[in-house]
Design a protein with these regions (language model features):
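Right-handed beta-helix
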Residues: 1-5
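Short, small-residue-biased leader/transition segments that mark boundaries at the very start
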Residues: 6-19
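Active-site acidic carboxylates
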Residues: 23-114, 135, 169, 178, ...
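Histidine-anchored nucleotide/phosphate-binding helix
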Residues: 57-61, 153-163
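Active-site-proximal beta-strand/loop segments in catalytic clefts of secreted hydrolases
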Residues: 71-74, 118, 146, 173-174
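Internal catalytic-core helix/loop-beta-alpha segment
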Residues: 96-150
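Short, small-residue-enriched loops and turns at beta-alpha junctions
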Residues: 122-123, 175-179
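Metal-ion/cofactor- or nucleotide/acyl-coenzyme-handling active-site neighborhoods
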Residues: 142-143, 158-161, 178
Length: 199
């Protein structure tokens, strides 16, 4: 993979073909960047807390010594007819809209295709992590992104259930919730479930 600086186009690998940037012994580290999309940052469901974590997430990706995966919340035009749409009647992350796009400064760092997901937790992501671990043992999986209390907690718990012997880490400084209170509640819930919270 490479970034063409002349056109800013990214030539991407599939997730499973992604090679770790470097390894600790024979073990690889994984960073999962959850739903860092415009609608969750300063769009339809944006918050000032989400805006505030963007520089830290960018730095985390740039300095991460391992494989970086991205998830992308993806809804269709009939979103309001879905169960989620009925409970949260705010159209967001509709496929091919500006709000659906990963934040540009983060997307420029992406080296694999995003894992699109229609709901909070991604079984595709969990399956990808299991497959990666079978190919080359994973030392740790770190989660950052949005929202702490919805999609971060859902995917961190799926990873914990799928790979119970792999340390799961959430970088609290690089996450934001729907509210500061729900962010803290989610961190506490994950900690009870033996997920490491880095503050």
């Amino acid at each position: 993979f490479f970034i063409d600086t002349a056109t800013s186009d990214i030539n991407t690998l599939s997730h499973h073909d992604a090679l770790p940037i470097s390894r600790d012994g024979n073990m690889q580290k994984v960073l999962v960047v959850v739903d860092m999309q415009n609608d969750f940052i300063d769009g339809a469901l944006g918050t000032k807390e989400a805006v505030a974590i963007v520089p830290g997430v960018k730095e985390k990706i740039e300095n991460f010594d391992g494989v970086v995966l991205f998830t992308r919340d993806t809804h269709e035009t009939y979103y309001l007819d879905t169960q989620e749409g009925q409970k949260l009647p705010v159209p967001h992350c509709i496929r091919d809209t500006e709000g659906w796009q990963i934040r540009s400064e983060l997307d420029a760092l992406r080296k694999t295709e995003p894992i699109d997901k229609e709901t909070f937790g991604s079984t595709d992501l969990a399956g990808e992590l299991v497959a990666m671990n079978e190919d080359n043992e994973i030392k740790s999986i770190t989660f950052v992104g949005l929202c702490t209390d919805i999609c971060v907690i859902s995917n961190a718990l799926l990873a914990k259930a799928s790979l119970p012997e792999v340390p799961i880490i959430v970088d609290a400084k690089c996450c934001a919730g729907v509210t500061p209170e729900s962010h803290e509640n989610a961190l506490k819930a994950m900690e009870v479930c033996q997920i490491q919270i880095d503050r």
